[in-house]
Amino acid sequence: MNLHEYQAKQIFAQYGIPIPAGRVATSPEEASDAARALGGSLWVVKAQVHAGGRGKAGGVKLVQDLDGVRNAAAAMLGKRLVTRQTGVEGLPTTKVYVESGSSIAREIYLSLVLNRETSRITFIASAAGGMDIEEVAAKTPERIISVGVHPAAGLQGFQCRQLAFGLGLAGGQIDEFARLANALYRLYLERDASLVEVNPLIVTSEGRLVALDAKINIEENALFRQPEIAALRDPSQEDPVEREASEHDLNYVSLDGDIACMVNGAGLAMATMDLIKLHGRAPANFLDVGGGATSERVTEAFKLILSNRKVRAILVNIFGGIVRCDLIAEGIVNAVQQVGVKIPVVVRLEGTNADAARKTLAASGLAITPARDLTDAATKVVMLARGTSPRPSPASGRGRRDEHPRRQQDQGCLPGLHRQAGHVSFGAMSGLRHAAGRRRDARARRPETPRIACVRYGARCGG
């Protein structure tokens, strides 16, 4: 769950992290009154949306009089702010944050994230903070400092000094930075955060450290023990389809493709999406109906899928371990009849009562295309999305070796999913390939050398 800047700064203040004085406003008049109450002759008006890149998109304005505050707020409120992180539709601005201006001598980047490879909370810092930190990380990665914290030992003084020295701090700033770093670390742990970011952390002209911006993301699965933070959720900043999915216990993420996926299990869902990508199309969504999938949940899943008008075909891929395939088949038939599905549907069912499930689908008389395995399912749904008729599946066997998807793979882009174009280890990729039905060489005794694969859905990756 994401928090607005003003909400994150309220939490910062509770942990003694220095921030500029500021107030929230929902109208131009409130913004002007807030600036008057703050005093001074320099203010910053910031649009409150759950996205970065606001400064370059006109969502942050520096003004020097009350009329300027009012005009800046009027230009933001009620509008949709489009940044590099929002997509073309942007996010609605219902609040602005009016903050006292600060004298900036230097800008620093500082954040805490969980490094899943080392299983450690990790500080990431750079002396080149500010709006261009992504460019700095891409072009000059040597300017990024990373320090992992052992979960048993906790944050140590030498690690704080290591970060401070790397950021070029000196004198009393080192002790000040150590206090700030410890406060951020406690916040991260106690609030069940998945990200705490300060960009920029400024050094003022007086030499003080001040958090000029604040971003906090909270782990969704821990919200049950963070009721105060859960109450801060802003539904206007969330995808309405994803929000509706969560109300039905469905894990749904919108993507840019045109083939919808309905799968039980996150790993199988990722493998399914990979094969769609390998066969030349892109998935329209990530949808995990979970291990306890029911007929009702399948119906709701179809409704969510069909709310996306870009979808040209649907692939249902269910492995019945806990869930019974015959119940899922009944749910699919009911959903297709109830919702009125007008686009091709390909179904692959394996596991508990799979034979009975196939009979249910065949007896329904509906235009549902069965698939014998995952590769066959991906091939058929891609052909149907293109408007061509798939070849009927053979009665048995796994198909010719020439039909293996590896021959069609674009070697410039390894498959996988990370919602914000992150990094997935090669070991994880191997697991996905295995789940997707690829053969492993039984003679290979040594593991392959680990490497990193950059993964972007909807964009090509460099080799």
Language-model features: locations:
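Amphipathic alpha-helical interaction surfaces in cytosolic regulatory modules
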Residues: 324-345
